[in-house]
Regions:
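Conserved, carboxylate-rich catalytic/transport cores that coordinate ions
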Residues: 1-6, 18-21, 25-32, 276-637
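Long, charged N-terminal accessory/stalk domains
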Residues: 1-336, 364, 371-374, 378
Length: 637
């Protein structure tokens, strides 16, 4: 169901603002509405969050992979007390990070210098002495290998040194000749490069740079080791990060408030069933306040909160993946949950797969204690596994083995499955179509009820019930083939005809002229084809159920009838073969189960979204986002 909401208005003294916001945050009950500029007080809190996030990311490469397990628990006060010590750790990490960055910059600078000097290693002259004089032009640089010959022919004195694709070149010529041969030198691709203030020979500088690079690399290793030593502190930083995020959210909430020098005003949305709890929390802090709860006004952007029984709540994940219902409309979650449960089991339809899935999801919920969407998805899979256990017995297999094989020689040999998809595909298709028609009729009845609730009687009859009558009438035409009286088919014919006439005449009742109404009605009658298409959509239940069983049987045949048979003849080989085939068979079945589960989840959801929700559901709801503890690493007690 959609929880009724109230609009909260609270006025209190400014000195109690922090305590009141902490109390509201602790009960996670109020979504604030911005009513003014407020004060921009969250910059410092956001800065703390950013610093802690950066520190956590910095330590990630040095920390081991997170193990599976429930989140640790802590109180808000404990998390907030961790912030200052963690910020001190951040300061040390930031210092190390700066030194590592500087080290990297210095190392790269020396590597570049080393690379530029290596081609000159054979030149014995000190680099500071290689320069032009009053009468001689001296140039050092590089020339492409293909330009060497042309450079030698320019008329300048050229001395070549090391290099592969590019050669280091010392070019000397009289000053008075330089202007004439400079264009020829440039045409060879010669790029002049100076040694700057480097002193000593190239080989001496190469050795110096290599020594400095080695020292820098050793220093970097030490810095990295010091950084790695902080890895155990990562959990402390994570706790502090959650505490800082709580502070940040509370500080940001202040920006939504209006205030004077002595008082503040707060408005927001609160669940109707939480109003008294909000009042009690405020009364614990002060008795000087004004608090009012009002019903939403028309045009208000009211957030949507879903509340269902423990059994139905997991299916809210399926609804949320589609869209929350608009506030004041129908929550489709409890309405579609039984069908999702049944269809999922029929699609997976293998008892062993269902048992493994249910146990795995149960263990995930019990020991890892997920929250939010992950918890609900695990709940859906657990219930889907339970459904699969029974549907596998009724319509499917057991780890790819047919039930007649398992029950061979017993009284149940010809009892299960009730319908075998592989031997009676038409029977299974009829069952799927019947479930589909029931599913869609149920959706139309919900839409009819909604119309009656809003006193739209014509909508209830023409837009909804007439389609049930039309489809039912068409189905009744098959009555004689089922051994029923022809009068049933005759009644169905007239039921469909009368309903079709009503749709033709009144489906376009919103049009002002008769011609427009009739044209609209004729177009509406064409929707009968979409009904037929929707019924065919339920064939996917048969298709996925059949594929699960057939592929499971193929895996068993490959592993046991073919691969294991190749080991027969030698007892030792048979033992080795049995182990290999068992491991391979289990691995293949697990892989098959995972792939099939994904397909079942998606296709079952698709049937709810298109064939079911499409007939009555009003999407577009906005999620309720109260001020609360939005933590990532720790559950707040």
């Amino acid at each position: 169901m959609i929880v009724p909401m109230k609009k909260l208005t609270l006025a209190a003294l400014l000195e109690h603002r922090e305590a009141i916001l902490q109390a509201l945050q602790s009960i996670c009950a109020v979504q604030l509405i911005s009513i003014g500029e407020g004060e921009q007080s969250s910059a410092a809190a956001e800065g703390r969050v950013q610093r802690l996030q950066s520190a956590e990311e910095l330590l990630k490469p040095y920390a081991g992979k997170a193990g599976f397990g429930p989140k640790p628990e802590a109180t808000r006060q404990e998390l907030e007390e961790d912030i200052q010590p963690a910020l001190e750790i951040c300061a040390e990490l930031e210092g190390l990070q700066r030194r590592i960055a500087q080290n990297g910059s210095d190392t790269e600078k020396r590597r570049l210098q080393l690379g530029s000097l290596l081609p000159w290693a054979d030149m014995t002259d000190p680099l500071e002495k290689v320069h032009s004089t009053a009468s001689i032009k001296v140039m050092t640089g590089t020339v492409p290998a293909e330009g060497v010959k042309a450079l030698m022919e320019t008329g300048a004195l050229v001395q070549l040194y090391g290099g592969d694709k590019e050669r280091a070149a010392l070019v000397i010529c009289p000053n008075e000749e330089y202007a004439g041969i400079a264009p020829s030198i440039r045409a060879t691709g010669f790029q002049e490069k100076c040694f700057g203030d480097i002193r000593g020979t190239a080989s001496e500088n190469i050795q110096r740079l290599r020594t400095e690079i080695e020292a820098l690399e050793a220093e970097r290793a030490q810095l990295e080791a010091r950084l790695a030593a902080f890895a155990p502190k990562r959990e402390e930083i994570r706790r502090a990060l959650d505490g800082a995020a709580i502070d940040r959210d509370r500080e940001q909430s202040k920006e939504a408030l209006a205030h004077t020098n002595t008082a503040f005003l707060l408005t927001g949305w609160v669940r109707e069933d939480m109003t008294e709890k909000v009042r009690r929390e405020i009364e614990k802090i002060t008795d000087v306040y004004y608090l009012a709860f009002e019903d939403p006004s028309e045009g208000d952007a009211v957030p949507t909160v879903l509340k269902n029984s423990r059994l139905i709540t997991p299916y809210e994940a399926v609804t949320n993946l589609y869209s929350l219902p608009a506030y004041g409309t129908i929550d489709g979650t409890p309405l579609m949950a039984p069908f999702y449960f049944i269809f999922f089991g029929m699609m997976l339809s293998d008892t062993v797969y269902g048992a493994v899935l249910a146990l795995g999801a149960w263990a995930f919920l019990k020991y890892l204690k997920p929250t939010g969407m992950m918890k609900n998805l695990a709940g859906v899979l657990m219930q889907g596994g339970i459904s699969t256990i029974f549907m596998g017995l009724l319509f499917g297999t057991c780890a790819g083995v047919g039930w007649p094989v398992i029950f061979r020689g017993t009284a149940l040999e010809n009892t299960f499955p009730l319908i075998d998809s592989s031997t009676n595909p038409m029977g299974m298709l009829m069952v799927c179509a019947a479930f589909g028609i029931i599913h869609m009729f149920y959706a139309v009845l919900i839409a009819t009820w909604n119309c009656l609730k809003h006193k739209d009687y014509m909508g209830a009859l023409i837009d909804n019930m007439c389609w049930i009558f039309i489809v039912s009438g068409l189905i009744m035409q098959a009555a004689p083939m089922a051994g029923l009286s022809r009068s049933v088919a005759e009644f169905g014919k007239w039921l469909a005809i009368v309903s079709a006439v009503l749709v033709f005449l009144f489906a376009g009742r919103s049009k002002k002229n008769i011609a427009g109404r009739l044209i609209s009605g004729a177009g509406k009658l064409y929707d009968v084809t979409s009904w037929l298409g929707d019924v065919l959509s339920y064939a996917r239940i048969f298709a996925l159920g059949l594929s699960t069983g057939v592929i499971g049987m193929v895996l068993n045949t490959l592993c046991w009838d073919m691969l294991f048979a190749s080991f027969k003849g030698n007892p030792a080989l048979m033992l080795v073969g049995f182990i290999i085939v068992t491991v391979l068979s289990v691995a293949l079945h697990v892989f098959m189960m995972l792939i099939s589960t994904l397909g079942c989840f998606v296709h079952t959801a698709r049937l709810q979204y298109v064939e079911f929700f499409g007939k009555f559901y009003e999407a577009g709801g906005k999620a309720f986002r109260p001020l609360g503890y939005n933590t990532k690493y720790v559950n707040v007690k």
